[in-house]
């Protein structure tokens, strides 16, 4: 397969992003070129066997992957990995799975995880929808995090946004009862779409009430995407949803929930 991530003639990772043959769907991402440093290449060469999960299209036993029956947290589109690394450092009791299609970001996080001596983080370099559909069992996830997904701000591109009704229904299936969905965006229009979709999704309950959001929770560090957006005058919206029908865990709008222990 031809690797889509060539840049400056650099050799690219031996575990490239792959697209399942014979499938056509609207993608929520583009395969952007980016500089791939020698250190990031070494990370793929040397660290992928330890931290990487190759997409196979077959159901995966996550407890066997991590060697323990701990709660599982999935971050979709982890970018440079800052939030995922922070979470793993401060929450060793849970296992973390990250999905990202941008190879340099994956390489950077691989090096960071090695520096940290992390043992409870695994990464996919693949399309999140295919991973969820084919490799993650229903009810397997304690939490799903989606921080600053591509806003596709042009009206004609809105259909490419990740948060769509079918995707929300997929997340409900993969979350356990009582599980949590945490989404964040710095685009007001995307926040509106997230409310339109997620508030209407059966099985999801907005902790802050309809069209509500909370202050940035302690478990999400301020990212460079967020900082950039604030410099441009954008607001930031953190949306928390429980995968349950009860309303006992609702938060007041703008009030940050306690960080997990």
UniProtKB/Swiss-Prot annotation:
The keyword RNA-binding does not apply. InterPro entries: SAM-dependent_MTases_sf, tRNA_(Gua-N-7)_MeTrfase_Trmb, tRNA_methyltr_TrmB_bact. The active site is at residue 150. SUPFAM superfamilies: S-adenosyl-L-methionine-dependent methyltransferases. It comes from the Bacteria. S-adenosyl-L-methionine binds at residues 75, 100, 127, 150. Pathway: tRNA modification; N(7)-methylguanine-tRNA biosynthesis. Keywords: Methyltransferase, S-adenosyl-L-methionine, Transferase, tRNA processing. Belongs to the class I-like SAM-binding methyltransferase superfamily. TrmB family. Catalyzes the formation of N(7)-methylguanine at position 46 (m7G46) in tRNA. This is tRNA (guanine-N(7)-)-methyltransferase. The lineage of its organism: Bacteria, Pseudomonadati, Pseudomonadota, Gammaproteobacteria, Lysobacterales. The gene is trmB.
């Amino acid at each position: 397969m031809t690797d889509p991530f060539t840049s400056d003639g650099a050799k690219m990772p031996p575990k490239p992003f792959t697209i399942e043959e014979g499938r056509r769907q609207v993608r929520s991402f583009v395969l952007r070129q980016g500089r791939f440093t020698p250190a990031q290449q070494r990370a793929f060469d040397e660290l992928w066997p330890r931290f990487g999960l190759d997409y196979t299209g077959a159901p995966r036993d996550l407890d066997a992957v991590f060697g323990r029956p701990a709660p599982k947290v999935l971050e979709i589109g982890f970018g440079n990995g800052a939030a995922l690394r922070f979470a793993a450092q401060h929450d060793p009791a849970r296992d973390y799975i990250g999905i990202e299609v941008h190879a340099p970001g994956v390489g950077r996080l691989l090096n960071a995880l090695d520096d940290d001596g992390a043992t409870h983080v695994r990464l996919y370099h693949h399309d999140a929808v295919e991973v969820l559909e084919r490799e993650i069992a229903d009810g397997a996830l304690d939490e799903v995090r989606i921080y600053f997904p591509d806003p596709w701000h042009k009206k004609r591109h809105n259909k490419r946004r990740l948060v769509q009704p079918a995707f929300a229904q997929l997340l409900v299936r993969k979350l356990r009862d009582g599980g949590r969905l945490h989404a964040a965006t710095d685009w007001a229009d995307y926040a509106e779409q997230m409310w339109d979709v997620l508030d209407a999704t059966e099985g999801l309950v907005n902790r802050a009430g309809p069209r509500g959001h909370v202050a940035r929770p302690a478990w999400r560090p301020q990212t460079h995407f967020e900082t950039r957006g604030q410099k441009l005058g954008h607001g930031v919206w953190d949306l928390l949803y429980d995968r349950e029908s009860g309303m006992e865990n609702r938060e007041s709008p703008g009030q940050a929930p306690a960080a997990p222990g």
